[in-house]
């Protein structure tokens, strides 16, 4: 009985114990439930806040977009008005020209009439005298008749010497008549002249009694006929041509000569009747140059009569006529020279000299010289003639060309002043006056970049030719005068001396005329600029100082830019100086300059005028440039400049540095806008400059990177140019249309001015100077322009050398000819005169020869220097490559370790799969239960976060608006000029920078080893990454199955162990703790990243143009994304969607964290007391918040950053292009992974959605929204926002999932379209991918990239500093967030791969021009995608299998989803948000997807169960690497793996690319074939990766598990996430160890761990990431259910959640199907290059991509610049918001962290990339 009693007691005790235990468990469960409910409420509140904030941001974006469009319209209107004014002026000019021509013709006719009258009078006098003599001596009647005949004969024969005498006298008379006839003729009615001419011609026949007048005209006609008959036809034809072309000149010369002749004839006639006919005959021959034409036109009878008469005296008359013609030509040249001395401009002199020389040559019979001169002068001469005509017309209008030029310059000056004022007043006003003024200037600039270089070379040629012509004319005039002296014209030697003096003066003037022209051009420019051009040197110095100040003051005032823009006008000299400097820079700058100076010196000697001002200016300019170059040497760009310095050493470096300073400072300033605006112009220049610079850079930087870049550049350039042209056509259609109109107007002006082109040339030079100044302001543009100009100058120098040689040749033959006639000259004085002239010519020739030799030597020296530079660049590139390879080696090692970790984690996960699945099932139910309240909480929380973000974003948007306004103000100027220049310069700078990156690469490679690594390395890395991808994909497939099983088991076990409430509470706590840690991590990473990013930002300042250009499309994409964001907001509004997003997000976040943190973070988060999971929750929240933020804030942020980033896109687009190129290269490195995977598709999707331009705007919009959201969050809501953001994100996740689902469909479609576009952009994307891969090599590069991205855009310097400060201010929460993001990045690597592919797709699809930026954007979007992967979506990407299923499902849908994918670009942000929301829990996610994701999360939880204690909140477990916390944890885990992560990012991105590689490739198919190829290459590399079964690598294809960081980059998106989870777990420990480093290490060598973590996480995630496909499927289903467009982003979001669930379901399948699915994504990638890519990853990643792309297009692109900074701020400022945003940004942050690789990528998207990153971080 006692035993029974005791047994009963024991039973009771046991029951009591059980009851107590159950009660305690119940209490714990209730506590968890209460926490989960609270978290859900908070999430709801934050979601509501985020939604409200997003709405506000959307409104702001819309307002900003409207404002921007209004400005564009104003600019277009102003441009149209300006064009109309220009057309009116041109018409007026033409009318004046015709009037002048008529007046000249009338003057000629009057002169003929006077001659005929004088001849008639003389004839009558002779008759009267003969009659008188006969009457007086009637017996001498016969003698009288003979006497009468004798005068006639005398008139015929003696007329010849007297004609010659008149010819000699003409110089005396003509100097004054030449200028005087014009005013006189102008005063004289044309009709009177015509009548008089007709009357004269009419009377000539009636002068039967006066045979002399007919003879007189006969000699003229006879001369014409004789010339036609006896004279070489070439002479006559040449004369005819000259008469036709230079006819005004002839008319002027003839009129002046005729006037002088008539004056003499009248005087002589009054004195000597015999001399009148002779004089008349002489003047008739002088007139004959026209006269053959005029009289031939006027009457053939006279001509026939003249010819009959002439036939009598044919021989003598012909000789006389020939001599007279030569003399006349020489005299005319001398007269023209004297006239020039009298006030005619050197241009006129040159112009007149050209035709005079031609005529003289013709008269001399110097046909060869004529042909040469005609050829040389036909261009310059015709233009000179045209300019002389215009000058004559101007003179005829009593306005000297100088006056006209001054007027034009004054108008231009006034316009510049007005432009400055308008710039000061505002961009809208600026756009109008700029549109009016600058369009012409822009057109002139457009023409000036091309035309100006041509004009410079042409001017140089013209000057040389003018000098030649002056020398030749002098020589010819001397020869002619000698001939005349030999054929005693009866003209005193004094006249000959005078003529020779005039010729010498003329030669000096002509020699100095180039200089004078330049100076005169500068003078009008000075007049216009209100500043003397000689002070142009001072101005150059001032300009350099101003540029430095402006660069230092970030181009504080638009006026300075305008002044600098005016200075560019002044820099016509400066351009000449630049030409010299560039010649020297190309020819060691100094030697060409010295040669030019030497050339100028002999010219000075010849000209008797010192060219020293120009030389001094050049020297000063070069000195300033050298100083600036030396000053800016410190910066990486300075290194680039140093590399370029040999080419551009002084000016280019100085300009680049100043421009860098300005660009860096003004990148955030309107300069970006201006650059964008100006980029159309600049792009033309930049394209020219890029072509030159590419040539130079390719020559100088023949390194593999340069070769790759050059190889890619042709493609990129073509694509970029095409894209830029398309973007310019789109974004700059307004600009380019005004610019084209301006160019057309400018061309018309050139046509008008073409005749006085010199004013236009001066304007062109001025415009070039403005452009150069603006280009200097946009260092890259200046650098490129400088290089281009240097090349042009070199060419011009060569041409000038050639021209000098030709001149020497011409002068030498002329000298020889002249010497022969001079020798023949009997007059010693004439010989003396000729000798000095010969000496002068010989001296000039000798000096020219010496100069030529010196120039040749300098060119040789330059070539040697270039070869040395090339060698150094190649060596530096090789060292970079070595470093990259070394970086890749640790990455591969890390990847291998990560793969091993992933395998271990897989085993552990498999062990925990059952328990995790059970826990996951329990957790699913709990989470479902929790997600409902959580969805409301998330909504509240997301709303709060959104509201906070909105408030902060509003603050930042206001800042952004202010910055945008400032930028807008500065931009209008730079929009018109720097834009094209900046674009071209940015291209050239991109090229140069890319080339210089070789040199800088060594230094930058430390920070951006992948980035700096040459495209070859990038390609190599891409291949290795592809191998790694395949390995990672294989590993990820296995890991995905294991992970899915583990996650499901972990989830089930966690669900069981952790009651729903506890799991929910713990999820929230984990999210919060993970968010906090992630925020800390992201803070650390952000700090670390920001520091290198700041460096890179400074470096990327040159790329700001490209970023700005990219931002333009980003702005467009933002606009599109605005709609997407609206859809996202709408989707976010749905609690269910938020809950869905939140469930998968929470699950994924837990899974992600669990998986990601399992090895490291299980310990780390357990060690961190689930702070990691709290952080992960925060990450999830942040992901949700970011989902909401990406969607809502993306919209609002798009509005805000749309402006900022629109500005950044505008100003930074060119640089961003450069950055895009470099970053494309870098992004191709690391971006091969993420850029391929996600970057582009996102952007492409958005572009597909709204079109290429719209996509960039949408991207920009989202980027801005996300960026604005990110920044405000970063600033205002450091940690409070974090929970709010978490809640908001949770809510946003709930809403966003639907949004994302819808948006993802739309985004997928967009992604398809974009990917198609991206396919075109593949080359650049591939480069970007490689760059992305390389950036993934080193976190330094990531940080540098981030810093570069932060600093990269114009606002990069400032915002980078702010971000840096914020980042530093932000507790390591941001670093943690970044690190967590890094963890996410490990997972997001997938997202990145997807996003990069999306970005690449969006980049290339979004805009071909922004392609580079898309590369960055790819990186950014890749980061978003990668960060988005931290959400379930990322986990899905991390789950190769689900991705594969999804990829299969998606890939069929991929094509449609591709289209949606492009829409998903918009939706990708939504998907990203969905991920984040899914991390928060996508309550709205279909239960199937939720179940699938939950199962996936359970499997991940199982893995986490192994690594994390059951007590670890499922939030940790379920926080998949995709979860913000997972990402944070993962990022933190990956932080040791941060390098692995970085690389892992790259590899993870490749993994994502591998997973998304099908999508990525398809994206790349859209994005670029390179993208898919790179994915395939990455897959191949992945297959080659050690530790990964080739089969796995094949399956992973482009998602190599992560043994190789590159593989991670390449294929390891899913694998990257799987690895990232594994390595994130290992790396979690390492990350806790390396924590801060890991951010860099992720980027650096950490990828392997990150890859392992990511691969493991990816495999786990691929279990969940498999969802990605299912996401895409479910997402597509949801998207299909929801409006693809409106819900496109939502589609992505819900699709992501659905994908998460699907990933879970697929993860189960994916385990089995993982290889198949991975293969399938690849297959689908092949099958659906666009869709498959997007959907391969888009299956998981396209959603991520789409989401990230969407968020990243929205956030990624726009945030690329603004958001990168803003998001970075957000990461820093609002750890929780960051973490929420980190959930989004984690996907995006993966991209920001990936952005670290993106650093390496240093996209021109630096700003946009940062924004994308920030959005990614958000």
Curated annotation (Swiss-Prot):
GO terms for cellular component: intermediate filament. Residues 1698-1708 have a biased composition (Low complexity). InterPro entries: IF_conserved, IF_rod_dom, Nestin. Residues 292-303, 400-427, 434-443, 495-508, 521-536, 565-586, 599-614, 643-664, 711-732, 744-773, 868-886, 1342-1361, 1401-1416 have a biased composition (Basic and acidic residues). Residues 1490-1505, 1570-1579, 1616-1636 have a biased composition (Acidic residues). Gene3D superfamilies: 1.20.5.170. Keywords: Coiled coil, Developmental protein, Intermediate filament, Isopeptide bond, Neurogenesis, Phosphoprotein, Ubl conjugation. The modification Phosphothreonine is found at residues 137, 160, 210. Residues 15-17 are annotated as: Linker 2. Residues 266-309, 336-355, 377-451, 480-787, 866-900, 945-998, 1134-1262, 1334-1818 are annotated as: Disordered. The keyword Cell membrane does not apply. The modification Phosphoserine is found at residues 133, 180, 288, 390, 400, 448, 513, 591, 737, 803, 824, 915, 957, 1052, 1063, 1073, 1123, 1134, 1162, 1238, 1495, 1499, 1523, 1614, 1623, 1698, 1700, 1791, 1814-1815. Residues 382-398, 986-997, 1686-1697 have a biased composition (Polar residues). There is a cross-link at residue 1043 (Glycyl lysine isopeptide (Lys-Gly) (interchain with G-Cter in SUMO2)). Residues 136-1818 are annotated as: Tail. GO terms for biological process: brain development; embryonic camera-type eye development; positive regulation of intermediate filament depolymerization; positive regulation of neural precursor cell proliferation. Residues 1-14 are annotated as: Coil 1B. Constitutively phosphorylated. This increases during mitosis when the cytoplasmic intermediate filament network is reorganized. Interacts with FHOD3. Forms homodimers and homotetramers in vitro. In mixtures with other intermediate filament proteins such as vimentin and alpha-internexin, preferentially forms heterodimers which can assemble to form intermediate filaments if nestin does not exceed 25%. Belongs to the intermediate filament family. Required for brain and eye development. Promotes the disassembly of phosphorylated vimentin intermediate filaments (IF) during mitosis and may play a role in the trafficking and distribution of IF proteins and other cellular factors to daughter cells during progenitor cell division. Required for survival, renewal and mitogen-stimulated proliferation of neural progenitor cells. This is Nestin. It comes from Mesocricetus auratus. The gene is NES.
């Amino acid at each position: 009985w006692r035993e029974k009693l005791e047994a009963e007691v024991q039973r009771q005790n046991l029951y009591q114990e059980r009851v107590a235990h159950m009660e305690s468990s119940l209490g714990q469960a209730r506590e968890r439930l209460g926490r989960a409910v609270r978290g859900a409420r908070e999430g709801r509140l934050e979601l509501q806040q985020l939604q409200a904030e997003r709405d506000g941001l959307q409104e702001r974006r819309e307002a900003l977009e409207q404002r921007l469009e209004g400005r564009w319209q104003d600019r277009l209107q102003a441009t149209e008005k300006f064009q109309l004014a220009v057309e009116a002026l041109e018409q007026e000019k033409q009318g004046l020209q015709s009037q002048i021509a008529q007046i000249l013709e009338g003057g000629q006719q009057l002169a003929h009439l006077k001659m005929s009258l004088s001849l008639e009078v003389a004839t009558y006098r002779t008759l009267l005298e003969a009659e008188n003599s006969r009457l007086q001596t009637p017996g001498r009647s016969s003698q009288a008749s003979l006497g009468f005949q004798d005068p006639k004969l005398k008139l015929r024969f003696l007329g010849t010497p007297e004609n010659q005498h008149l010819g000699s006298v003409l110089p005396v008379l003509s100097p004054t008549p030449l200028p005087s006839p014009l005013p006189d003729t102008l005063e004289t009615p044309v009709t009177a002249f015509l009548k008089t001419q007709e009357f004269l011609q009419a009377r000539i026949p009636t002068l039967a009694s006066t045979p002399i007048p007919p003879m007189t005209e006969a000699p003229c006609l006879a001369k014409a006929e004789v010339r036609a008959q006896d004279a070489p036809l070439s002479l006559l034809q040449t004369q005819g041509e000259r008469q036709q072309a230079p006819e005004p000149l002839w008319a002027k010369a003839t009129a002046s000569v005729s006037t002088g002749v008539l004056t003499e004839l009248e005087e002589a006639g009054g004195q000597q009747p015999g001399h009148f006919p002779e004089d008349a005959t002489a003047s008739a021959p002088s007139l004959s140059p026209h006269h053959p034409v005029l009289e031939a036109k006027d009457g053939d009878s006279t001509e026939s009569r003249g010819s009959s008469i002439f036939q009598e005296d044919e021989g003598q008359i012909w000789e006389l006529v020939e001599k007279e013609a030569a003399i006349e030509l020489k005299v005319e040249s001398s007269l023209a020279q004297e006239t020039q001395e009298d006030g005619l401009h050197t241009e006129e002199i040159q112009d007149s000299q050209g035709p005079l020389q031609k005529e003289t040559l013709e008269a001399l019979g110097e046909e060869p010289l004529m042909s040469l001169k005609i050829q040389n002068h036909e261009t310059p001469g015709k233009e000179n003639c045209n300019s002389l005509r215009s000058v004559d017309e101007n003179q005829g209008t009593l306005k000297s060309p100088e006056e006209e030029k001054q007027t034009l310059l004054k108008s231009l000056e006034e316009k510049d002043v007005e432009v400055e004022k308008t710039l000061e007043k505002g961009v809208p006003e600026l756009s109008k006056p700029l549109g009016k003024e600058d369009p012409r200037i822009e057109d002139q600039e457009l023409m000036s970049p091309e035309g100006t270089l041509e004009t410079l070379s042409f001017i140089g040629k013209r000057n040389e030719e003018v000098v030649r012509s002056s020398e030749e004319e002098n020589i010819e005039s001397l020869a002619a005068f000698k001939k005349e002296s030999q054929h005693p014209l009866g003209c005193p030697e004094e006249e000959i001396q005078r003529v020779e003096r005039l010729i010498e003066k003329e030669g000096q003037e002509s020699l100095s005329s180039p200089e004078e022209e330049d100076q005169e051009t500068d003078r009008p420019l000075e007049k216009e600029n209100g500043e003397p051009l000689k002070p142009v040197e001072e101005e150059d110095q001032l300009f350099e100082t101003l540029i430095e100040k402006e660069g230092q003051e970030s181009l504080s005032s638009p006026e300075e830019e305008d002044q600098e823009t005016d200075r560019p006008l002044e820099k016509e000299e400066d351009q000449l100086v630049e030409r010299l400097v560039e010649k020297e820079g190309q020819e060691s700058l100094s030697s060409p300059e010295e040669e030019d100076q030497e050339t100028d010196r002999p010219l000075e000697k010849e000209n008797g005028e010192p060219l020293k001002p120009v030389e001094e200016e050049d020297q000063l300019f070069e000195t300033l440039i050298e100083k600036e170059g030396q000053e800016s040497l410190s910066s990486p760009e300075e290194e680039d400049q140093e590399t370029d310095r040999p080419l551009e050493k002084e000016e280019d470096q100085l300009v680049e540095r100043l421009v860098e300073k300005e660009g860096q400072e003004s990148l955030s300033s309107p300069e970006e806008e201006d650059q964008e605006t100006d980029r159309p112009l600049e792009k033309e220049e930049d394209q020219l400059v890029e072509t030159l610079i590419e040539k130079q850079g390719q020559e100088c930087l023949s390194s593999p990177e340069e070769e790759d870049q050059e190889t890619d550049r042709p493609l990129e350039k073509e694509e970029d140019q095409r894209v830029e042209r398309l973007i310019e056509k789109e974004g700059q259609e307004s600009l380019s249309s005004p610019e084209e109109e301006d160019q057309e107007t400018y061309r018309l002006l050139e046509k008008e001015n073409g005749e006085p082109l010199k004013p236009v040339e001066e304007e062109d030079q001025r415009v070039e100077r403005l452009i150069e100044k603006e280009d200097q302001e946009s260092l890259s543009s200046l650098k490129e322009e400088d290089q281009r100009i240097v090349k042009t100058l070199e060419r011009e120098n060569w041409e000038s050398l050639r021209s000098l040689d030709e001149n020497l040749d011409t002068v030498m033959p002329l000298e020889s000819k002249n010497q022969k006639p001079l020798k023949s000259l009997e007059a010693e004085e004439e010989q003396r005169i000729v000798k000095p002239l010969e000496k002068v010519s010989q001296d000039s020739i000798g000096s020219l020869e010496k100069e030529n030799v010196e120039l040749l030597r300098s060119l040789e020296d330059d070539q040697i220097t270039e070869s040395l530079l090339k060698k150094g660049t190649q060596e530096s590139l090789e060292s970079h490559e070595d470093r990259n390879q070394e970086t890749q080696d640790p990455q591969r090692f890390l990847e291998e370790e990560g793969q091993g970790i992933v395998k271990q984690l897989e085993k552990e996960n498999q062990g925990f799969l059952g328990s995790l699945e059970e826990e996951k099932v329990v957790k699913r139910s709990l989470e479902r239960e929790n997600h409902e309240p959580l969805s409301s909480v998330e909504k509240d929380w997301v709303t709060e976060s959104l509201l906070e973000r909105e408030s902060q974003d509003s603050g930042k948007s206001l800042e952004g608006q202010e910055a945008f306004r400032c930028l807008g103000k500065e931009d209008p100027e730079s929009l018109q000029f720097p834009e094209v220049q900046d674009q071209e310069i940015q291209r050239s700078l991109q090229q140069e920078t890319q080339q210089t990156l070789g040199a800088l690469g060594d230094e930058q490679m430390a920070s951006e080893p992948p980035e700096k690594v040459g495209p070859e390395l990038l390609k190599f890395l891409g291949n290795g990454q592809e191998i790694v991808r395949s390995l990672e994909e294989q590993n990820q497939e296995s890991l995905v199955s294991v992970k899915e099983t583990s996650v499901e088991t972990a989830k089930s076990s966690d669900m069981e162990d952790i009651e729903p409430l506890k799991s929910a509470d713990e999820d929230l706590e984990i999210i919060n703790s993970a968010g906090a840690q992630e925020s800390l991590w992201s803070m650390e990473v952000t700090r670390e990243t920001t520091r290198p990013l700041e460096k890179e930002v400074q470096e990327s300042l040159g790329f700001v143009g490209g970023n700005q250009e990219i931002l333009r499309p980003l702005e467009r994409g933002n606009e599109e994304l605005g709609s997407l964001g609206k859809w996202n907001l709408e989707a976010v509004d749905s609690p269910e969607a938020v809950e869905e997003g939140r469930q998968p997000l929470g699950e994924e976040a837990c899974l992600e964290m669990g998986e990601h943190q399992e090895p490291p973070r299980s310990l780390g988060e357990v060690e961190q007391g689930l702070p990691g999971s709290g952080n992960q929750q925060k990450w999830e929240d942040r992901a949700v918040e970011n989902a909401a933020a990406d969607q809502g804030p993306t919209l609002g942020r798009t509005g805000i950053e749309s402006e900022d980033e629109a500005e950044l896109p505008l100003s930074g687009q060119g640089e961003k292009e450069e950055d895009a190129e470099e970053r494309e290269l870098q992004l191709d490195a690391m971006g091969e992974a993420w850029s391929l995977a996600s970057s582009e598709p996102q952007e492409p999707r958005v572009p597909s959605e709204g079109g290429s331009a719209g996509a960039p705007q949408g991207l920009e919009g989202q980027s801005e929204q996300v960026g604005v959201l990110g920044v405000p969050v970063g600033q205002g809501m450091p940690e409070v926002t974090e929970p709010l953001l978490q809640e908001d994100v949770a809510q946003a996740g709930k809403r966003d999932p639907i949004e994302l689902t819808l948006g993802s469909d739309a985004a997928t479609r967009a992604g398809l379209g974009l990917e198609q576009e991206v396919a075109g952009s593949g080359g650049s994307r591939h480069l970007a991918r490689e760059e992305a891969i390389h950036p993934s090599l080193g976190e330094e590069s990531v940080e540098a990239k981030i810093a570069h991205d932060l600093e990269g855009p114009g606002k990069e310097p400032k915002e980078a500093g702010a971000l840096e400060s914020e980042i530093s201010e932000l507790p390591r929460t941001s670093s943690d967030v970044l690190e967590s993001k890094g963890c996410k990045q490990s997972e997001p690597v997938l997202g990145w791969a997807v996003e990069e592919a999306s970005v690449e797709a969006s980049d290339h699809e979004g805009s071909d021009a922004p392609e580079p930026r898309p590369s960055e954007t790819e990186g950014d979007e890749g980061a978003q995608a990668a960060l988005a992967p931290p959400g379930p979506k990322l986990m899905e990407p991390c789950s190769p299998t689900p991705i594969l299923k999804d990829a299969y499902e998606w890939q069929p849908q991929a094509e449609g989803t591709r289209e949606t994918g492009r829409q998903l670009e918009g939706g990708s942000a939504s998907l990203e948000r969905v991920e984040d929301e899914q991390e928060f829990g996508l309550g709205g996610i279909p239960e199937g997807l939720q179940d699938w994701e939950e199962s996936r999360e359970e499997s991940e939880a199982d893995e986490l169960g192994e690594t994390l204690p059951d007590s670890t909140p499922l939030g940790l477990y379920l926080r998949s690497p995709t979860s913000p916390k997972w990402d944070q944890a993962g990022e933190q885990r990956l932080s040791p793996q941060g390098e692995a992560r970085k690389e892992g990012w790259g590899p993870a991105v490749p993994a994502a690319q591998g997973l998304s590689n099908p999508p990525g490739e398809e994206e790349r198919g859209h994005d670029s074939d390179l993208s898919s190829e790179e994915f395939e290459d990455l897959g191949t590399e992945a297959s080659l990766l050690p530790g990964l079964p080739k089969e796995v690598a094949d399956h992973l294809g482009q998602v190599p598990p992560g043994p190789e960081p590159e593989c991670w980059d390449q294929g390891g998106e899913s694998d990257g996430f799987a690895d990232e989870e594994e390595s994130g777990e290992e790396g979690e420990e390492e990350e806790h160890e390396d924590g801060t480093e890991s951010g860099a290490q992720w980027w650096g060598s950490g990828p392997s761990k990150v890859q392992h973590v990511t691969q493991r996480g990816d495999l786990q995630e691929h279990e969940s990431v498999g969802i990605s496909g299912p996401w895409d499927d479910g997402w597509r289903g949801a998207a299909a259910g929801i409006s693809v467009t409106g819900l496109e982003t939502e589609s992505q979001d819900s699709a992501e959640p659905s994908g998460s669930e699907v990933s879970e379901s697929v993860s189960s399948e994916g385990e089995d199907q993982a290889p198949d699915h991975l293969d399938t994504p690849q297959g689908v990638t092949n099958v659906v290059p666009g869709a498959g890519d997007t959907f391969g990853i888009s299956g998981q990643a396209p959603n991520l991509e789409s989401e990230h792309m969407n968020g990243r297009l929205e956030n990624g692109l726009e945030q690329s610049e603004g958001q990168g900074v803003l998001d970075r701020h957000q990461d820093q400022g609002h750890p929780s918001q960051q973490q929420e945003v980190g959930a989004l940004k984690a996907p995006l942050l993966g991209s920001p962290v990936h952005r670290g690789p993106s650093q390496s990528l240093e996209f021109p998207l630096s700003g946009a990339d940062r924004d994308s990153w920030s959005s990614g971080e958000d």
